[in-house]
């Protein structure tokens, strides 16, 4: 899921784009969260016996437990979360979804075998692979959020794309997801690990798109071409193309069209492009995703007072949660929702958009950086050729 190896490319090429910090550093900020990705992470947090959390009736409750307590943790730290759920997947994603379904079926068979003959590690590994987020999981989490007074929206298609729209329009500070393709949808800031448990002690990663592009010396179109070449959810990857090769090819040839042209003409035949590889369609999905505009009435979000008695009815009487814990958490949520109304200092200052002259200057800077990197690649190639041509022992 997402873009293969993109984080390691950014870490190597644009380290200044990544900031790490504690959850409390996000105090006073509104954040749009990829709900489906979060629910999936709650569901794969299986116990050592390979089972998900269940109530006495045998119903899975991992998703509700995760959504309830992780959301409480965010609000405790002064964050105002809003969740974005996936709608229907784009047609181009159907191939990837079919593959995931096949992998899950194979994992289910592997899980049964591991339960009979394998170790605890095998059971846990296969349990994770069988997990999928269902409509029921989504519906129950939406019901829970409504009772908590936390807003949510269902995206027309990809949740990450909708999160990016809201962040770009300034409705939220950032988009939060583990999927790196959120950056391809033009999210100015991506937060990762925001919904992780406190026990994992993972710092919150804050990735700034503008600094990513600057570090790579690329404009957005080139960046998306790089991401498609690295491997995205919409297309099969090209065999033998890893992160360093993908980066080198985009820097040398400039566009995916020219990379494909070069691959097809390569006399050594090193790369086999999959037969059905509509990269132009994938690029269009990143540039023109099906999303609700930020000024859509459904994007007018409101954080409400939690319905504590409703939470008791749903979580305690229907799902078997502890009444004392839910009541205590509900009271704390109500109190923290009031304090999270406090704004950060930067919220009082309006960020002025760049002038046309500033945009042109920024574009020139990126082009110069790209040219320098292309020259460097050419020089490295020449050096390698010289070394190869040198007689041994010379």
Curated annotation (Swiss-Prot):
One of its GO terms (biological process) is base-excision repair. Transmembrane segments: none annotated. DNA binds at residues 47, 70, 158, 231, 233. Residues 356-383 have a biased composition (Basic and acidic residues). Mg(2+) 2 binds at residues 179, 181, 233. Mg(2+) 1 binds at residues 34, 86, 158, 160. GO terms for molecular function: 5'-3' exonuclease activity; 5'-flap endonuclease activity; DNA binding; magnesium ion binding. Binds 2 magnesium ions per subunit. They probably participate in the reaction catalyzed by the enzyme. May bind an additional third magnesium ion after substrate binding. Residues 1-104 are annotated as: N-domain. Residues 341-349 are annotated as: Interaction with PCNA. It is found in: Nucleus, Nucleolus; Nucleus, Nucleoplasm; Mitochondrion. One of its GO terms (cellular component) is nucleus. Residues 384-394 have a biased composition (Basic residues). Its cofactor is Mg(2+). Keywords: DNA damage, DNA repair, DNA replication, Endonuclease, Exonuclease, Hydrolase, Magnesium, Metal-binding, Mitochondrion, Nuclease, Nucleus, Phosphoprotein. It is an enzyme of class 3 (hydrolase). Belongs to the XPG/RAD2 endonuclease family. FEN1 subfamily. Structure-specific nuclease with 5'-flap endonuclease and 5'-3' exonuclease activities involved in DNA replication and repair. During DNA replication, cleaves the 5'-overhanging flap structure that is generated by displacement synthesis when DNA polymerase encounters the 5'-end of a downstream Okazaki fragment. It enters the flap from the 5'-end and then tracks to cleave the flap base, leaving a nick for ligation. Also involved in the long patch base excision repair (LP-BER) pathway, by cleaving within the apurinic/apyrimidinic (AP) site-terminated flap. PANTHER family: FLAP ENDONUCLEASE 1 (PTHR11081:SF9), FLAP ENDONUCLEASE FAMILY MEMBER (PTHR11081). This is Flap endonuclease 1. It comes from Neurospora crassa (strain ATCC 24698 / 74-OR23-1A / CBS 708.71 / DSM 1257 / FGSC 987).
